[in-house]
Swiss-Prot record:
Compartment list: Plastid, Chloroplast thylakoid lumen
Protein name: Carboxyl-terminal-processing peptidase 1, chloroplastic
Residue span, PDZ domain: 189-273
Gene that this sequence comes from: CTPA1
Chief place of localization: plastid
Catalytic EC class: hydrolase
PANTHER family cross-referenced by the UniProt entry: CARBOXYL-TERMINAL-PROCESSING PEPTIDASE 1, CHLOROPLASTIC, TAIL-SPECIFIC PROTEASE
C-alpha cells in the first residue's frame, strides 16, 4: 500500500512560545542594509503498489530526510460540560454490521500474519519498487536495462541470511547515486510509522473506501501515549474531533484539530474496525504547542509608513494558523507593507508550506507542480481561496532557505505576489517515498521533484533572488506591477 504522510520536521527545531510572538527589539542582519526598515532578525491517499506500504514524504530538510518533531497546533477549545458528560461510552454499531460475532471477525482480520518471504524475495521486492518509481535526478544514468542486469547478477547466487539480504539492498540502493534513496531496518521503519504530529501519540492516514470516499485511520500508535492509554487502537477510524465531523477532511487538517497546549483535552470519536463499536474518548494532550512565528511592526519614511515584519523559523503544524494571527494583528496595527523572513528556514511540513503560500495567492494560482515517473507523482497544486492580504510583500531568503520554504518563495514570486531578497536558496526540491517491505524493513526512494509555477526545477540550483539588499518599497511595487503585466500578456 502507498500512503501520503503530510508531515516532516526540519533539521533542528527550537522551543518556541505557544502563540505568535510580538518582538520588541530585533538585531539587524549584517548582510542587509535598509535605512527605512531597521533591526530585522536573521532567521494519505492510499493505493496499491507491489504489496508494499509506502509513506510519501512530502517534506524534509536538505540534510535529514526523516526527523521527529513535537511541535503541535494552537489550542482547540475544550468541549462544553454537556458534551463531556457523554464521553467514554459506546455508541450504537453501524447498521451494516449485523452482530458482534461478525464484528469481532472483521477486527481480527486486521491481525492476520503476513506470509513468509525468502531472502531473495525481499531483495526482489526492493528492486521492484525502485524499478517502478525511482526518479533519477542526479546522474541521469539509470536505465531499466542496467537495473535488470543488476538484479540478475545479484540473484544468480543464493542469499543465505536476512542480514545479508539487507546488506544487498543497501548496496543496490547506494549504486543509484541518490543520497536520499536508502534502506531502513525494521526498527527504523517501525519508528517512522509511529511518527506523531498530533500531540496525542497517533499517526493518521487517509484510506479510500472504494466508493470515492476517504476515511481517516490510525496508521501508527505510540506505546503508552495519551491516545494509547485512552483506548485508541491501531486501525481505528476517526469520526469526529471535539464533536466536529471530520468527513472529507485531510489527515493534515484533522491533525491540526487534535493539537493543542499540554494538559488540555481533546475528544476523539473513533470506530474500532470495520464493524466494531463507536466510542468517544477524552484524551489529555502531552506536549506544549510551539509557534514558529514571531512578528513586529516597523515605522519607516519618518513614521509615515507601517511595515509588518514576520519571521518564520520552520513550517511545522502551527505555521499557517499562527501566520494568519500575526498578519491580522499587524493589519489591525496599520501595516500596509509586509516582510516575510524565510532565512535559515530549512523547511518542514510541505503541506504547511503549501497552505501558507495559498494565504497570499489568488484563487486558481498555481502553488507548485510535482513531476515523477509514477502518474500519481505528477500533480498541479492550485490555490482554492482568495488571498488574506494583497499588500506588497518582500520575502527574505538565503542559502539555508530550503524545501517547503522554497515552495513558498517560488509560489509567491512566480505569481507576482512578492519579490525575493537575499541569497540564492539551497535547492532541495525532491520527493521521497518510504515503502515497507514484507519483513518489516523498508526503503526510502526518490520518486519525484518539485517544479515552480514558472516551470523551474528547484533541486540543485535553488532560486535566485530579485535583489541582494532590501529595495525601496516604490521599487518593490514597480517590480510586482511589471510582473503582473507580463503574466497577463
Amino acid at each position: 500500500m502507498r500512503l501520503l504522510l503530510p508531515f516532516s520536521s526540519p533539521l533542528s527545531a527550537t522551543s518556541s512560545p505557544s502563540t505568535p510572538q510580538f518582538i520588541p527589539e530585533l538585531p539587524p542582519p549584517s548582510q542587509f542594509d535598509y535605512s527605512g526598515l531597521t533591526k530585522i532578525l536573521k532567521k494519505s491517499v492510499i493505493g496499491t503498489l507491489t504489496g508494499a506500504l509506502s509513506l510519501t514524504l512530502v517534506f524534509s530538510s536538505p540534510i535529514s530526510s526523516v526527523a521527529a518533531t513535537n511541535d503541535p497546533y494552537l489550542s482547540v477549545n475544550p468541549p462544553s460540560s454537556s458534551f463531556e458528560s457523554s464521553l467514554n461510552h459506546f455508541d450504537s454499531a453501524p447498521e451494516d454490521c449485523p452482530n458482534e460475532e461478525e464484528a469481532d471477525t472483521e477486527i481480527q482480520d486486521d491481525d492476520i500474519e503476513p506470509q513468509l518471504v525468502t531472502n531473495e524475495g525481499i531483495v526482489e521486492e526492493a528492486w521492484e519498487i525502485v524499478n517502478g518509481a525511482f526518479l533519477d535526478t542526479r546522474s541521469h544514468s539509470w536505465t531499466p536495462e542496467t537495473w535488470q542486469k543488476q538484479k540478475d547478477d545479484i540473484l544468480a547466487s543464493p542469499i543465505k541470511s536476512r542480514s545479508k539480504a539487507h546488506e544487498v539492498i543497501k548496496n543496490m540502493l547506494a549504486s543509484l547515486g541518490d543520497q536520499y534513496t536508502r534502506f531502513l531496518s525494521p526498527d527504523e521503519f517501525s519508528r517512522m510509522s509511529k511518527y506523531d504530529i498530533t500531540g496525542i501519540g497517533i499517526n493518521l492516514r487517509e484510506v479510500s473506501d472504494g466508493g470515492g470516499n476517504v476515511k481517516l485511520k490510525v496508521l501508527g500508535l505510540v506505546l503508552d501515549s495519551a491516545a494509547d492509554i485512552a483506548g485508541v487502537k491501531q486501525g481505528d477510524e476517526i469520526l469526529a474531533v471535539n464533536g466536529m465531523d471530520v468527513s472529507g477532511k485531510s489527515s493534515f487538517e484533522v491533525s491540526s484539530l487534535l493539537q493543542g497546549p499540554s494538559k488540555t483535552f481533546v475528544v476523539l470519536k473513533v470506530k474500532h474496525g470495520k464493524c466494531g463499536p463507536v466510542k468517544s474518548l477524552k484524551i489529555q494532550r502531552q506536549v506544549n504547542a510551539q509557534t514558529p512565528v514571531s512578528y513586529r511592526l516597523e515605522k519607516v519614511d519618518n513614521g509615515t509608513v507601517s511595515v509588518g515584519y514576520i519571521r518564520l523559523k520552520e513550517f511545522n503544524a502551527l505555521a499557517r494558523k499562527d501566520l494568519v494571527i500575526a498578519m491580522k494583528r499587524l493589519l489591525d496595527k496599520g501595516a500596509s507593507y509586509f516582510v516575510m523572513d524565510l532565512r535559515d528556514n530549512l523547511g518542514g511540513l510541505v503541506q504547511a508550506g503549501i497552505e501558507t503560500a495559498k494565504l497570499f495567492l489568488d484563487e486558481g494560482d498555481t502553488v507548485i507542480y510535482t513531476a515523477g515517473r509514477d502518474p500519481e507523482a505528477q500533480k498541479t497544486v492550485v490555490s482554492d481561496k482568495k488571498p488574506l492580504i494583497t499588500a506588497p510583500l518582500i520575502v527574505m531568503v538565503n542559502n539555508r532557505t530550503a524545501s517547503a520554504s522554497e515552495i513558498v518563495a517560488s509560489a509567491l514570486h512566480d505569481n507576482c505576489k512578492a519579490v525575493l531578497v537575499g541569497e540564492r536558496t539551497y535547492g532541495k526540491g525532491l520527493i521521497q517515498s518510504v515503502y515497507e517491505l514484507r519483513d518489516g524493513s523498508g526503503v526510502v526512494v526518490t520518486i519525484g521533484k518539485y517544479v515552480t509555477p514558472n516551470h523551474m526545477d528547484i533541486n540543485g540550483g535553488g532560486i535566485e533572488p530579485d535583489f541582494r539588499n532590501l529595495p525601496a518599497w516604490d521599487e518593490v511595487k514597480e517590480r510586482l506591477s511589471k510582473c503582473s503585466i507580463l503574466q497577463q500578456s
